[in-house]
């Protein structure tokens, strides 16, 4: 598929997925989030990972709060995204407790993240990551992912490959409504290792 056609197909699919997500009730979003939290906690890749990056969820994403609490209860090391909005650059920076999240300033997307002047341990500078939880608008069962069009995670995964010998395991968290038959992709789009949703089988 030509680049312009891929871009057009992505735009169209993003619109459709946003409609699907808007149609979900808060109760259904919470129900599926709880199911996925339990799947994550039982997942072999999660259990063996020590250094984990996880996104702080927006309203139309799987709620990650319970997973974050479990990361700390198990003594794992937790990193969250710090986006630079003037570019597609993103770092994963360390937080020390779940309670810290409520004290962070919020971005224009209403996501808490440490400010630019807040000096923190950055994952790729101190040993890399074992596991990255991936957000997204849509996914297919082959691991193709449709993001929001900014390219933050694709660029970050490429940096991971330059900084660490073993690629981090990538685990996408999705509502059933976000699973597509086929996600249009180009050569810059990075596949995820596994898409986790209510009806998926887990490792």
From Swiss-Prot:
Its cofactor is Mg(2+). Mg(2+) binds at residues 154, 189. One of its GO terms (biological process) is formate metabolic process. Its EC number is 6.3.3.2. Changing residue 145 to A: Reduces activity by 98%. Substrate binds at residues 56, 61, 148-152. Keywords: Acetylation, ATP-binding, Cytoplasm, Disease variant, Epilepsy, Folate-binding, Ligase, Magnesium, Metal-binding, Nucleotide-binding. Its main location: cytoplasm. The modification N-acetylalanine is found at residue 2. It is found in: Cytoplasm. One of its GO terms (cellular component) is cytoplasm. It catalyses: (6S)-5-formyl-5,6,7,8-tetrahydrofolate + ATP = (6R)-5,10-methenyltetrahydrofolate + ADP + phosphate. GO terms for molecular function: 5-formyltetrahydrofolate cyclo-ligase activity; ATP binding; folic acid binding; metal ion binding. ATP binds at residues 10-14, 145-153. InterPro entries: FTHF_cligase (IPR002698), FTHF_cligase-like_sf (IPR024185), NagB/RpiA_transferase-like (IPR037171). Belongs to the 5-formyltetrahydrofolate cyclo-ligase family. Contributes to tetrahydrofolate metabolism. Helps regulate carbon flow through the folate-dependent one-carbon metabolic network that supplies carbon for the biosynthesis of purines, thymidine and amino acids. Catalyzes the irreversible conversion of 5-formyltetrahydrofolate (5-FTHF) to yield 5,10-methenyltetrahydrofolate. Monomer. It is linked to Neurodevelopmental disorder with microcephaly, epilepsy, and hypomyelination: An autosomal recessive neurodevelopmental disorder with onset at birth or in early infancy, and characterized by microcephaly, short stature, severe global developmental delay, progressive spasticity, and epilepsy. Brain imaging shows delayed myelination, hypomyelination, enlarged ventricles, and cerebellar atrophy. This is 5-formyltetrahydrofolate cyclo-ligase. It comes from Homo sapiens (Human).
């Amino acid at each position: 598929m030509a680049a312009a056609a891929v871009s057009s197909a992505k735009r169209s699919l993003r619109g459709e997925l946003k409609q699907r997500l808007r149609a979900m009730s808060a109760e259904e979003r919470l129900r599926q989030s709880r199911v996925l939290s339990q799947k994550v906690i039982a997942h072999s890749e999660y259990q063996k990972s020590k250094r984990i990056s996880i996104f702080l969820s927006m309203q139309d994403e799987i709620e990650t709060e319970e997973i974050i609490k479990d990361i700390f209860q198990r003594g794992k090391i937790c990193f969250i995204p710090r986006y630079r909005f003037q570019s597609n650059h993103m770092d994963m920076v360390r937080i020390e407790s779940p309670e810290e999240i409520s004290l962070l300033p919020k971005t224009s997307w209403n996501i808490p993240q440490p400010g630019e002047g807040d000096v923190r341990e950055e994952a790729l500078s101190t040993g890399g990551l074992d596991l990255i939880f991936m957000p997204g608008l849509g996914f297919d069962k082959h691991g193709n992912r449709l993001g929001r069009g900014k390219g933050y995670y694709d660029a970050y995964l490429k940096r991971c490959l330059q900084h660490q010998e073993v690629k981090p395991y990538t685990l996408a968290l999705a509502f059933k409504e976000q699973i597509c038959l086929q996600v249009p992709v180009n050569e810059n789009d990075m596949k995820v290792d596994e898409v986790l949703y209510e009806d998926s089988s887990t490792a």
